[in-house]
């Protein structure tokens, strides 16, 4: 059974688009960042959804491009004393939870996530208090405070396996915050899930009619879908999975043309994986609507070269991530449970 809970959330105002840099300015900041990374004994960790030039810089400087969990794991294992996290705020918090001894910097602490914003801790605590018999499972896309309330943290790459495991133990679940991913997991496992109703502003915009028209235009294309997308979009997919799983699917599918329903930032690494294949963006407009995100997270776009240089140079309250130690210790428990469970899956 899956029962939906819908918090009263407002439509989130988007941040202003960063001012474009000239070619000369980009070259200046790239060299400055490379120098500052060496001087600070720092390493860049960037999410798949950041802009291509940011991912490229992370590659060139020995950093990491991955999903939020692997970003934090990479940072925890890396000998650098400072981590520059190019992503959104919960990713910086997760890095700090796993690496409290390190300095965690972000280009801006104003880089939000609609899933995080849609799950305020006070309301979530009250929701959990009303259902004390349920195991609390929260998606990685949540604040440190919400993680601290959870029994488990989960990423999309192991969500089905974890919920299937908990269901086999007879446990009833509270799932937060992504309703689409929650529905997908419930359908795959049959688990008893009480689901918080949040959504990713990017994946929530994919449209079935527009996708159908694109599929008709390219009938030889496979459709790759992130499970944060609406159920109707997921049902059209040839492959469903997390960011890393979609990149893997792009390599294994025989199709030479791929329609990709996730943030277009993933195209940088996906195209590297399948250089001979054509990648098409799944449509986010149509059916009488225009897109707001247009397949790219506006907060991810805040991770620009100038902001990265400023973070490495200025530090301070505008760039450094802090997590209260007692909160960090509580949030670390469900995170470590997830890491241990993921290790068993890898064998």
From Swiss-Prot:
UniProt EC number: 2.5.1.72
Binding site for [4Fe-4S] cluster: 113, 200, 297
Cellular component terms per the entry's GO annotation: cytosol
Cellular location(s): Cytoplasm
Major subcellular location class: cytoplasm
One record GO biological process: 'de novo' NAD biosynthetic process from L-aspartate
Catalytic activity: iminosuccinate + dihydroxyacetone phosphate = quinolinate + phosphate + 2 H2O + H(+)
KW Cytoplasm (keyword) present: yes
Keywords on record: 4Fe-4S, Cytoplasm, Iron, Iron-sulfur, Metal-binding, Pyridine nucleotide biosynthesis, Transferase
This protein's pathway: Cofactor biosynthesis; NAD(+) biosynthesis; quinolinate from iminoaspartate: step 1/1
Protein function: Catalyzes the condensation of iminoaspartate with dihydroxyacetone phosphate to form quinolinate.
Family: Belongs to the quinolinate synthase family. Type 1 subfamily.
Protein name: Quinolinate synthase
Source species taxonomy: Bacteria, Pseudomonadati, Pseudomonadota, Gammaproteobacteria, Enterobacterales
Gene encoding the protein: nadA
